Design a protein with these regions (language model features):
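Solvent-exposed, non-transmembrane regions of membrane-associated and secreted proteins
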Residues: 1-154
Length: 154
């Protein structure tokens, strides 16, 4: 039991890094395979979605139908990854997943489902969430508030 406790942080960090690398690689490969028309359709669908947000009756919760639509957008790899956050200062790249449940936040960055999708545009406000409560976040602890991060979507 003692050995397990000593090895857990290292094994956990390795496992999370492996998962993040695989998710980012799969995402990048799938986006690279999109032809220009597919890419533009994905982007336009996300922009249309963002324009509907201010018109919703409940701005902070999605209906089941809205949730299905949300999860289908910016999902080029089919595994829920909608983009990548890069923090060049520490050489860190993390996948951005749909939603912010505990399972997502343990391994990656989550997108708050009722906020704008990360495609930019006037009046949009994309909210990304991550926390530092697990071992593989050691790198992120070194990031100052002034560090620049970039989010990439298809």
């Amino acid at each position: 039991a003692g050995l397990f406790l000593l090895l857990y942080p290292t094994v956990s960090d390795y496992w999370n890094s492996l998962h993040q690398t695989r998710a980012i690689t799969r995402y990048a490969e799938n986006v690279a395979q999109l032809d220009r028309t597919e890419y533009e359709e994905i982007w336009a669908a996300a922009q249309r979605y963002n324009r509907t947000l201010p018109k919703r009756e409940n701005a902070f919760a999605l209906t089941e139908e809205q949730k299905r639509e949300y999860e289908s957008l910016l999902n080029a790899s089919g595994n829920g990854v909608m983009g990548i956050v890069e923090i060049p200062k520490i050489g860190c790249a993390l996948p951005i997943y749909h939603g912010t449940d505990d399972a997502v936040l343990q391994i990656a960055v989550g997108h708050l489902e009722w906020s704008s999708l990360p495609v930019g545009g006037g009046g949009t406000h994309c909210v990304l969430s991550a926390h530092r409560a697990f071992q593989s976040s050691v790198q992120r602890n070194a990031v100052s508030k002034s560090a620049l991060a970039a989010a990439h979507s298809p």
